[in-house]
A protein has these predicted regions:
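GST-like fold's C-terminal all-alpha helical module
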Residues: 93, 97-211, 244
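Acidic/histidine-enriched, glycine/proline-rich intrinsically disordered or flexible terminal extensions
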Residues: 222-244
Length: 244
């Protein structure tokens, strides 16, 4: 039975971190809101979100169904899928380390979102443009170096080598870092132009993942929705600036 992924149609968003893991593993899955028919489409997702409030009712997408089991939140979903897809070490301690790194990615992605919506999510970008400029300047000058510097050091200090974030094999954390680099380059092309020099291990990891057969096929397929100004990583030229 294929996994069922529930996320908003038309954007990569947070659902993309799940898709990359499923695509890399060659797992069978259905992107529910992109399908039509019974039990498909955005209406099917909303029925779950607006259904009876139980202990497993998600607050928001993405969420994943595996048979009768429902799992929500990106890091939680990947913590569940990792062992099943072979995208996390067998060592229990390293699995928790991977989860900690993924939760840090989650924190970073929230800060990315706040560059274009620093005041309120219910307001349009145009209604908070000046605040977004100030937030983006701080993000580029302080938050990108803080987060990417951390992930770069994590690679450098991995006792199993600097090709992977955790252990000696590909993990869902590596795939998520690929997505982070892709998204930052789209949103802030000027600010990221020196990434190869500033974060060589992260960029090398990104490039290796980009060239993996399953990922390369996915990126070239219509399943990979292009970045756009409705998602998390948005390109507004007025928010970008040259790298320091």
């Amino acid at each position: 039975m294929p996994y069922e992924l529930y996320y908003w149609d038309g954007i990569q968003g947070r659902g993309e971190f799940i898709r990359l893991a499923l695509e890399e593993a060659g797992a069978a899955y259905v992107d529910i809101t992109r399908e039509t028919g019974s039990g498909r489409g955005t209406s099917a997702m909303m029925r779950i979100l607006k259904g009876a409030d139980t202990s497993d009712t998600p607050f928001a997408p993405p969420f994943l169904k595996d048979g009768e089991l429902l799992v929500s939140h990106v890091a939680n979903i990947l913590f569940y899928l990792g062992p099943k897809l072979g995208l996390v070490p067998e060592n229990e301690g390293l699995r928790y380390a991977a989860n900690g790194l993924q939760l840090t990615v989650t924190d970073f992605v929230c800060e990315v979102h706040d560059t274009h919506h620093p005041i309120a999510t219910e307001l349009y970008y145009e209604d908070q443009k000046e605040a977004a400029k100030a937030r983006s300047t701080s993000f580029i000058e302080h938050r990108i170096p803080k987060y990417l510097g951390y992930f770069e050091r994590n690679l450098a200090n991995n006792p199993d080598g600097d090709r992977h974030s955790v252990g000696n094999g590909l993990s869902y954390v590596d795939l998520s870092l690929f997505q982070v680099i892709e998204g930052l380059r789209y949103a802030f092309p000027r600010a990221t132009q020196l990434f190869a020099r500033q974060y060589p291990l992260l960029v090398a990891l990104h490039d290796r993942i980009r060239d993996r057969p399953n990922i390369a096929r996915y990126l070239a397929s219509p399943r990979r929705i292009p970045f756009n100004e409705s998602g998390i990583f948005r390109h507004y030229p007025e928010l970008d600036q040259d790298a320091a």
